[in-house]
Amino acid sequence: TGTPEQAVNGNVTSLLPDAQQVGWIAGALAGLMTESGTIAFIGGMELDTTLGKYEGFKEAAAYVGEQAGKTVEALDIVYSGDFSATDKGIEFAKAMMDQGADVFFGDASAVDSGARQAIDEANAASGSVKIFDIAQPSDLLGQNECIICSQVTDNASLVGLCMEAVQSG
């Protein structure tokens, strides 16, 4: 086993969605939806893809917010250290809501589910949905009231584009 750069034949490569673009899409929506001007991002671990999503998220939110006449700032990213601790998601979301965050995005799997639980509880306590989450592909069913969209990458299309590039030289 090894990595693509260690491959001895030139026919091996890897495909990876552009994490910063994924973050940009989420950030653009966050910039439009935030009322408080404060947004939040929860990461599982400090990975390049997670950092890319966070950078795109905060950059796009600030840009789109400015275009809409408001200032949008992202709280510092927090990391749970894993991808399964829903209790950390609850803890992080509560702390970030206490700092005014009203739109969340994450890259932390089950930790994100915990965050959505805390967001839904805060919304229920206030009597209306005013705090939102931009979810991941596993959340397509919209099982939480706070979900305003779900980020989905289409790996079949990625492979198709790659094959077209190979065919065209």
Task: Give the positions of each predicted feature.
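A residue-level marker of the well-folded mature domains of exported/periplasmic proteins
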Residues: T1-G169
